[in-house]
């Protein structure tokens, strides 16, 4: 074997894109920024940083782990607190992701859609299954959904969208065990159906589109966009979304 790329942390979902003939992956970002450097990282920053990463991986690239993490707000790599005084002058030399995704959501599978059953906008786009966070306290856990990223010639052509929701079956996830199901894997059937698997009970869902594809457009996506207000999907408010202390929960 040969070294293809380096500086990659905890990749679970990896996929070859036949349209671009390139390798792509979704990366789990690091944890515990507040625990390692409480003077410079608040508990809120610990919950929303760093990004999970959607990557196009080319031969010879270095993505900076463990020396850096990706800050989705600054849209740049940042030197990790453990290495601030280790002689690393800049994080600019490291490769960037195609997109930064919400922190700690645990992207566990990646699939590029090749079928024709869904409306045309989904062709060659990326589906990502988020297993869900375990350590965003004192804020609600996040993820537990499947998202879609529209793609054009191997690059994102829009923001990520909620594609499949309802796996957790609760509105506020205090801890991982509260979620009934956790999306884990993705597969495309011969007819273009999308299959989503769960890691807790081994359940599998089949997703099909049975309406008129030619009439599908932005209006059909509005209701899905509203889902981003749910506590396990939206960015937590620093004050309003603080969870009660364990000893006050009855």
Regions found by a protein language model. Name each.
Residues 186, 193-195, 204-207, 211:
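C-terminal amphipathic alpha-helical "assembly" element
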Residues 246-250:
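Short, solvent-exposed mixed-charge patches
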Residues 30, 201-202:
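Loop/turn residues immediately N-terminal
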Residues 20, 191-192:
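Conserved loop/turn motif of beta-propeller repeat scaffolds
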Residues 9-10, 15-177, 181, 207-243:
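Beta-propeller domain segments
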